[in-house]
Regions:
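Long, well-ordered core segments of solenoidal/helical folds
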Residues: 111-143, 166-187, 228-249, 288-313, ...
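Low-complexity, Ser/Thr/Pro/Gly-enriched N-terminal "stalk/linker" regions
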Residues: 30-148, 159-190, 308
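Carbohydrate-binding/catalytic loop surfaces
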Residues: 122-141, 184-203, 247-269, 310-332, ...
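Short proline/glycine-enriched turn/loop motifs at strand-loop junctions of beta-rich domains
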Residues: 385-390
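Well-ordered alpha-helical segments within folded domains of soluble proteins
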Residues: 80-87, 101, 143-159, 201-219, ...
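Glycine-centered tight-turn motifs at strand-turn-strand junctions
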Residues: 402-427
Length: 462
């Protein structure tokens, strides 16, 4: 775009001189940085929160800061990390009135834990007396609410004996209390930083499982008239595109993404389980929107699921990152597909479930790709395998002496290679490749590699 021309001072010297002389320097005040304290004050002054909430949250904030000063080492770092995360949300303008309860509950629980409770292992889950909520330890970010873990627990109560009804009720009410408005609907958000995604974010896996568990609980506890409107509000996330919601339109229907901050990453196990959740919500409540959202996702999943079958194992994700499942996620995907197969009797899901079950007892297929190398230099020894496995390579000389032994570790499917400093002595060497897949199925091959004499170096002239 061409720069706009303006009259120069030379052409209107008198006017410019007058204006420059008359104009006093203007000092612009820097815009105040958004902090927890300022955002609380703003919400209170604008009538978004009442006096009791304002006073209680200010007290929690002050207690956390005071406790941080009294702690040392890992305890101090964890509590400070939680506070920094909430401060970051405040700085980004995300500290809405509707989020204050779950966020200040997070601050309060972390202050309680790190003041007196044991240090934790990464991923360890804990609870507090008088509450059914599940908290998960995230190194550097302290204890965090974990929606999926909580909804898994709620599902267990809802499907279990009526002796669990009291605990089912407590957890259900606690989970409803931490739900927040999002995109015109209702969501259970994550407040931790994960894979570069800053909070707050949502997940189709957690949301779908959550609505399933709430619908089951509502039916079991005879609370459907009360909870159906909330369930319907929760469906809104499946109608909204990221980063607000989880819906990504495809040629076949709609894919529901696992992470709202990363819509190009397609994780199949989360998508499949979100469909199981939507299917159950539609069946339990009779809600037509839930049925339509399932149908939209079902059309996409029927096209997508076969693409995650490598012929020997399952893929965990595609598009932004394509990689194979580890054993846990392979089995989890198989189980989710079993659920979808049982509900829909759809050939695509039932076939994939059968394949993934079979792969758990099928050893990897190996093939030696390198058959000839020149001696006297470092060369590449290539081999291929059919599925992610722990592999090792051993080469023996014609004399029987081992000349290479490499533990390659866990490697993915496809063609792989190891570096080999090839001996100068020509002859037929033997390569042995051993591989054990993640389910413990072993395989091995042996094959010859011909080592050629090194090329003679040309003598320099004269």
């Amino acid at each position: 775009m061409a720069r706009r021309r303006t009259p120069s001072c030379a052409s209107i010297a008198v006017a410019c001189a007058f204006l420059l002389a008359a104009r006093a320097p203007v000092a612009y005040a820097a815009k105040p940085r958004k902090t927890i304290a300022r955002e609380l004050e703003k919400r209170y002054q604008r009538g978004k929160i009442d006096q009791a909430t304002y006073d209680a949250d200010r007290a929690v904030h002050a207690d956390v800061k005071r406790t941080i000063r009294s702690l040392r080492g890992a305890r101090r770092a964890e509590l400070a990390g939680v506070l920094a995360s909430v401060e970051g949300m405040a700085a980004r303008g995300a500290l809405r009135a509707s989020r204050l309860y779950p966020l200040f509950l997070t601050l309060q629980r972390n202050r309680e834990w790190w003041s007196s409770q044991p240090l934790l292992a990464a991923g360890q889950r804990v609870g507090f007396a008088g509450s059914e909520l599940v908290w998960q330890y995230v190194p550097g970010q302290g204890l965090q609410l974990h929606p999926l873990a909580n909804f898994g627990k709620l599902n267990a109560y809802a499907k279990g004996s009526r002796r669990n009804n009291a605990r089912n009720t407590v957890l259900l009410d606690e989970l409803m209390s931490i739900a927040v408005p999002r995109g015109g609907g209702l969501a259970w958000e994550y407040y931790l930083t994960f894979d570069g995604g800053r909070p707050p974010w949502v997940s189709s896996l957690a949301q779908g499982t959550g609505l399933q568990a709430i619908a089951r609980s509502a039916e079991k506890l005879d609370r459907m008239p009360e909870l159906l409107p909330r369930i319907q509000d929760g469906l809104k996330l499946f109608e909204q595109s990221p980063p607000t919601g989880v819906r990504v339109e495809t040629e076949d229907g709609a894919h529901y993404v696992q992470y709202s901050f990363w819509p190009s990453l397609r994780i199949i196990n989360g998508f499949v389980q979100s469909l199981v959740g939507l299917y159950d919500v539609a069946q339990i409540t009779g809600d037509k929107r839930a049925a339509k959202l399932f149908a939209d996702g079902d059309r996409a999943a029927r096209a997508e699921v076969p693409r995650y079958d490598t012929g020997a194992w399952s893929l965990y994700s595609r598009d932004a990152i394509t990689r194979e499942s580890d054993l846990h996620y392979h089995t989890l995907l198989r189980d989710f597909l079993t659920s979808l197969c049982d509900r829909t009797d759809t050939d695509v899901y039932c076939t994939a479930e059968s394949h993934f079950t079979g792969y758990l007892t099928t050893p990897p297929h190996l093939r030696l790709r390198t058959t000839r190398v020149r001696g006297g230099a470092t060369r590449t020894l290539r081999f291929s395998l059919s599925k992610i496995s722990r592999a090792s390579v051993r080469v023996t000389a014609p004399s029987g002496r081992t000349v290479l032994a490499v533990a390659a570790g866990v490697v993915g499917r496809g063609t792989r290679s190891v570096a080999w400093r090839v001996p100068r002595r020509a002859g037929d060497y033997t390569v042995r490749i051993d591989a054990t897949d993640l389910a413990g199925n072993p395989a091995s091959i042996e094959g010859p590699v011909q080592v050629l004499k090194p090329k003679r170096r040309k003598r320099a002239a004269g």
